[in-house]
Amino acid sequence: VKVKILGAGPDRQRLEELARQENAPVEFLGYQDHGSMAAWLRASDITVNSLVKSAVQSIVTKIGDYLASGKPMVNTGSSPEFRNKVTTDGFGLNVVAENPEALADVLEELARNPSLRKIMGARGRAVAEREFDQRTSYLAIVNLLRNLI
């Protein structure tokens, strides 16, 4: 298993040091432009929507990119709305944020089951095309706002 972490956050230095100390197979890639990020996601076997418990997001914008990759998603977000979507639409698995043992168990389960990864990835891609396509979703938002004015 190799872990690639895209983006940066306030804990990056601490996490890089921890990965070095543990000799963990983790590579911190930092900020990636959209094209590079999409390429990394497509090259992955599993994507992880990693959020801390205190995150207030409901459905973050990166979700559409994760789903479009056609890979299964492990979600650590706590939004009941999105956790239900993950389960109902069947494109991934939910894990409680900040529970590394549970995260490792779910990643191992997916790593050992390529057919499940393929099924979940295809479901995620279908959700992305149906609900996260900016050409149609942005137009729907504009129309909604026009109707409110």
Task: State where each predicted segment sits.
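Acidic donor-binding loop of glycosyltransferase active sites
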Residues: L41-S58, K71
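Active-site donor-sugar recognition loop in glycosyltransferases
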Residues: S36, S54-S58, G77-E81
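Short alpha-helical segment that forms part of, or immediately flanks, the ligand-binding pocket
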Residues: A38, V60-K71, F82-N84
